[in-house]
């Protein structure tokens, strides 16, 4: 049965729906039930309570939320700035040079985050750029891990902008700086906002590298969730997970809506 036939498409849709329910919806539903239950000793939880969410919005958990938002926005904005600059700079080179330089930007995404964290920890624990024990080392790790995705989004958007538009602006006497500010960047803005949304969601959920380098006072939500569940406090960890998922989804939806609005202007 070919996949492009009506029956094939219907079967593929059913399989995709089942896989989505089994591997995404059900685990998330279990986490939600755990966060709302007083105890879970049998097949299903017993009792209903919001105390776990109250705990998730106070004290150390609240500090972890603020730390995740601060690190996520700072690292994402810096990655976006560098991604735009790199994508614009690569346009000046030939196809082969662009291919090899792009591989350099994509390389961090192919390396396990734990390896990135260890490398940054070793590299910046001594010497003139010592950042161990500071916020900067966490920002550096997050920037390295998300920069490839930002660069990819911006490069895709830049490739879809016709060179004729910029050529027309140049023929009308626009300087390179004026052309960048008033032609290229406005057209590129939807992809920039999409890149920001993606990088922010990746930063908010990063755990592997952060576990190795985070300093006191900058515990992120994933680290806090891991610590709670590692101590056996599953319910509070589940509540904090729901908070993380909800905030990340809301931020992504808002940024994607802004990107869609900018694309229609």
From Swiss-Prot:
GO terms for biological process: transmembrane transport. Its main location: membrane. Residues 65-253 form the ABC transmembrane type-1 domain. It is found in: Cell inner membrane. It is a multi-pass membrane protein. Gene3D superfamilies: MetI-like. This is Putative 2-aminoethylphosphonate transport system permease protein PhnV. Keywords: Cell inner membrane, Cell membrane, Membrane, Transmembrane, Transmembrane helix, Transport. One of its GO terms (cellular component) is plasma membrane. The chain crosses the membrane at residues 13-33, 69-89, 104-124, 131-151, 185-205, 233-253. Belongs to the binding-protein-dependent transport system permease family. It comes from Salmonella choleraesuis (strain SC-B67). Probably part of the PhnSTUV complex (TC 3.A.1.11.5) involved in 2-aminoethylphosphonate import. Probably responsible for the translocation of the substrate across the membrane. It holds the Pfam family BPD_transp_1. InterPro entries: AminoethylPonate_ABC_PhnV, MetI-like, MetI-like_sf.
């Amino acid at each position: 049965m070919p996949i492009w036939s009506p029956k094939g498409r219907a079967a593929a849709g059913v399989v995709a729906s089942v896989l989505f329910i089994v591997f995404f919806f059900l685990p998330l539903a279990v986490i939600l039930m755990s966060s709302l239950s007083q105890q879970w000793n049998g097949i299903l939880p017993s009792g209903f309570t919001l105390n776990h969410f109250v705990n998730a919005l106070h004290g150390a958990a609240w500090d972890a939320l603020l730390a995740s938002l601060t690190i996520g926005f700072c690292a994402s904005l810096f990655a976006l700035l560098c991604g735009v600059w790199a994508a614009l700079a690569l346009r000046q080179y030939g196809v082969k040079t662009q291919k090899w330089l792009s591989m350099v930007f994509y390389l961090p995404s192919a390396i396990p985050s734990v390896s990135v964290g260890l490398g940054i920890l070793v590299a910046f624990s001594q010497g003139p750029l010592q950042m161990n024990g500071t916020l900067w080392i966490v920002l550096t790790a997050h920037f390295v891990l998300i920069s490839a995705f930002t660069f990819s989004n911006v490069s895709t958007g830049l490739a879809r902008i016709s060179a004729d538009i910029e050529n027309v602006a140049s023929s009308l006497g626009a300087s390179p700086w004026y052309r960048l500010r008033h032609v290229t960047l406005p057209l590129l803005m939807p992809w920039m906002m999409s890149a920001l949304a993606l990088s922010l969601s990746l930063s908010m959920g990063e755990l592997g590298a952060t576990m190795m380098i985070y300093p006191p006072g900058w515990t992120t939500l994933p680290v806090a969730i891991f610590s709670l569940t590692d101590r056996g406090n599953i319910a509070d960890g589940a509540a904090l997970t729901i908070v993380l998922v909800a905030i990340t989804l809301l931020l992504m939806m808002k940024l994607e809506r802004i990107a869609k609005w900018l694309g229609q202007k």
